[in-house]
Structures are given as C-alpha cells and as structure tokens.
From Swiss-Prot:
Gene symbol of the encoding locus: serS
Name of the featured protein: Serine--tRNA ligase
EC number of the protein: 6.1.1.11
Species this chain originates from: Nitrosospira multiformis (strain ATCC 25196 / NCIMB 11849 / C 71)
Main localization category: cytoplasm
GO biological process, one term: selenocysteine biosynthetic process
Length: 456
C-alpha cells in the first residue's frame, strides 16, 4: 500500500508513475473524498470544542443555581451532530482505504518504462541452448512416452490444469524440491520454514492479493458449526455468504489456499517490530501453490506450464530499507544458482513498468530455455516490494533513533518445481526417448542416471 501522505502531497507525480503501470488513478474520486475528509475532520474538531465548552457552562450554571436546561439541550444537539460527522468521516476514510488497497506499487526509477511484456529488457544470459540431431519433443510427449505422466487421469480426478506423476518422475519432482531447499539453506543462508497452506484474508491483504485479486484465489469458506451438514445438500448451500464484507467481499473467518508461500512467509513479521540486529531475515519454504488462473483462459492449456496446483520453493527476505536493492540482486542470484547447477540455459529479464506484479517496485524474471517451443519461459520472478507490503502488514523495525520504521520485503521463486521438471525433460531428452538426469540430482535419485521409457 502506498503512503497516504505521498498521495496528499505529490498526487500528480504519483498519478504519472501509476500511468506508466497502465493504472488509471481515480483522481477526481480521491480528490473529492480527500476534500470531504479535511472538512469533516475540521467539523468534528469544532463540534468537540463547542460541546466541551457547553459542558463547562452546565457546571458553572448549576454551581450558581441557574437553570441549565437550554445548555443541556445544546450539548445534546451538538452530540448528535458530532455522531453524524464522525459516522460520515468513518465512511469517507473507509472509501479512501478502499482506493489505497487497489493501487499498485510505484516503479523504481531503474525499471524500464513500457506498455507490455514486449518492452521487458534482457539483462543477461547463461548457458547455451542444446542442439539435437532429432526433432525435440515437448514434456507432455516425453512424459507420456516414459509412462510416468498422466493428464487424462488427472483430469478425471480433478479437471483441467492438473497433473498426475508416477514412479521415477514423481521421485525426480521430489528430488528437485529437496535439492533446491538444500542449496538455499546450506549455501545461501535461508532458514527452512514449514508454513500453513491455508491463510486468512488479513494475510492475503498484507501481501497484496486481496482485495484486488480475489478471483485468482481458491477460497475455503467455513461452515457455521450450528448448521447441520446434510448429506444430499450441495456444499455451497451449507456455507455462509459474506459477499457484503467491507474489506473487499471476503469474510475474515474464511480461509484461502495459498497462491504462493510468499504469503505465509511474509506475514510472519506482520504486526511486529523486528529487532534490527535480526536483519536480514531470510526464509525459504517448499509448498504446493493453488491458483484459479482466472485470467489465463486458453493459455498454456497443454502440459504442466500453467496449473491450478503446483509446487514451488519460495525465497523471502525481510531487510533494512537501505539494503533492499542489494538484496534483490542477491536473491535473484540465488535462484539463478539452481539453474546453473542443473546446467539449464536461462536468461534474466528486467520487467517493464506495465508488466510488473501488483506489489513490486522492481522485478527480474528468470526464463529457462524450452527446446520444443524454441523460446525462454518464466521459471522464477524475483521482486523488491520495498515498503508496500510492510505498510499493509505493519511490519517494522526500530531505526537508529529508536523509532519504528517500515521494513522492506522481497520474494522470489527458487524455483517453480514443475517448470524446472519440464525444463529437465525437454533439455535432457535423448533420441531413444530416455531423459538424462542432471548429475547434481543423481544422488537424490539413488544413483539413477536416466529415466527410461516403460517399454524399453
């Protein structure tokens, strides 16, 4: 969330920066509400002063034995006016808060300006894409030929955008996550963390998913305990409806499946004042992630690239504001290190103003080479959110003067496990249908060097 003081003092500058993000700031609405807020605050202060003055007159009149009924009536009238003014002030402040919660972060000055992903800027490349003396297959064909990847059964069980991995492919998927965690903990200094997979609305507001992106989430409403669960009644019919909630349409008692472990990891410092000696805080977690992909209809419908359920090893850093951009380079390098150890070619892209995520001030995307597509595809997104999330979470530390100051938060994938598996299948495929296992993973696979087709 942006600093309301910044909007009040540099509104035109903020609106211009937001326009670079393709966000149209509701200037007229905000200005009208802000003007009304100022007037109401002045009115409430004046009414309070008048009521206090009249209350003193009552005491003076009674001490002199005079009739105070007129003054009592005036105090009652002023009290009614004050209640009305305070009620309207609460409404106006809630409306301003609603606007604030919809506004994305401001881009850092180093972010390239652009209108679409085509304006993203390449920063560097690593590795050379492999060449094949045969036509490379995509991961779906490879997995099915191995007899270890079954999309039809996954669709039967759950529907579209789910995967079923078996045997050595499921083992390789698990090995990848274990390998990533080991590297980040042992070499990069992160603390492994086990987090809840269900979080409340306040946690999602803290990291910026709510209220703006509710449609991208899987919500798990809680059934009222007083209501019996009827065997033949639709589940939705037994659940309470809270669509009129003032906080963006969600009931704070309801839970949501995490879209990324960034949410629970970052919220560890919500409503806390952190000892500065503990900074930086570096956390990692391996979790499933759940996304509705509401805005992705028709995109990447084949295979594992875009799933409702996938696994990811997440990296989160909580840092002193003066160090956050150094931390962004470090965190991005930690994600890159995984690809380098796996010998997977990739490139790093600096996202332009229009392509960054809602909470980010600056983002690097890491894209891995997929031979069958002949292109690089995102496998990690590493962002510095500056104080944007910390302000929503009230995550602070004490500065040198002993005053609470907002922390800076960073997050990145280190990496998306499923997409890394896809990249291995495609980059290490062989003409006989087998897939070579990267050397750094063979120890996690009991010494297995190749995945071999089931009919070989």
């Amino acid at each position: 969330m942006l600093d309301i003081h910044l909007l009040r003092t540099q509104l035109d500058h903020v609106a211009r920066l937001l326009a670079e993000r393709n966000y149209v700031f509701p200037l007229a609405e905000f200005s009208a509400l802000e003007a009304e807020r100022k007037n109401l605050q002045t009115s409430t202060q004046e009414l309070q002063a008048r009521r206090n003055g009249a209350s003193k007159q009552i005491g003076n009149a009674k001490s002199r034995g005079e009739d105070a009924s007129a003054i009592l009536a005036e105090v009652a009238h002023l009290g009614d006016e004050l209640k009305q003014a305070e009620s309207r002030l609460d409404q106006v402040q809630a409306a301003l808060q609603h606007i604030l919660l919809q506004i994305p972060n401001l881009p850092h000055s180093s972010v390239p300006e652009g209108r679409s992903e085509s304006d993203n800027r390449e920063v560097r490349r690593w590795g050379t894409p492999p060449t094949f003396d045969f036509s490379p297959a995509d991961h779906v064909s490879i997995g099915e030929r191995l007899g270890l990847l079954d999309f039809p059964t996954a669709a039967k069980i759950s529907g579209a955008r789910f995967s079923l991995l078996t045997g050595s492919l499921a083992h390789l998927h698990r090995a990848l996550a274990q390998f990533m965690l080991d590297v980040h903990v042992r070499e990069h200094g992160y603390t492994e963390t086990y987090v809840p997979y269900l979080v409340n609305a306040e946690s999602l507001r803290g990291t910026g998913q709510l209220p703006k992106f509710k449609e991208d989430l899987f919500e798990v409403p809680r059934r009222k305990t007083a209501e019996p669960f009827l065997e033949n009644q639709p589940v939705a019919a037994t659940l309470p409806s809270n669509s009129n909630s003032p906080q963006g349409g969600q009931d704070d008692d309801d839970l949501y499946l995490i879209p990324t472990s960034e949410v629970p990891l970052s919220n560890i410092v919500r409503d806390r004042i952190v000892d500065p000696e503990l900074l930086p805080i570096k956390l990692t977690a391996h979790t499933p992630c759940f996304r509705s992909e509401a805005g992705s209809y028709g995109r990447d419908t084949r295979g594992m690239i875009r799933q409702h359920q996938f696994e990811k090893v997440e990296l989160v850093q909580i840092v002193h504001p003066a160090h956050s951009y150094k931390a962004l380079e470090e965190l991005t390098g930690h994600a890159e290190a995984i690809l380098q150890k796996l010998k997977l070619p990739y490139r790093v892209m600096a996202l332009c103003t229009a392509d960054m995520g809602f909470a980010a001030a600056k983002t690097y995307d890491i894209e891995v080479w997929l031979p069958q597509q002949g292109t690089y595809r995102e496998i990690s997104s590493c962002s510095n959110c500056e104080a944007f999330q910390a302000r929503r979470m009230q995550a602070r530390f004490r500065n040198e003067k002993g005053k609470p100051e907002l922390l800076h938060t960073l997050n990145g994938s280190g990496l998306a496990v499923g997409r890394t598996l896809v990249a291995i299948l495609e980059n290490f495929q062989n003409a006989d249908g087998s897939v070579s296992i990267p050397k750094v993973l063979q120890g996690y696979m009991g010494g297995t060097e190749r995945l071999v087709p089931h009919n070989a």
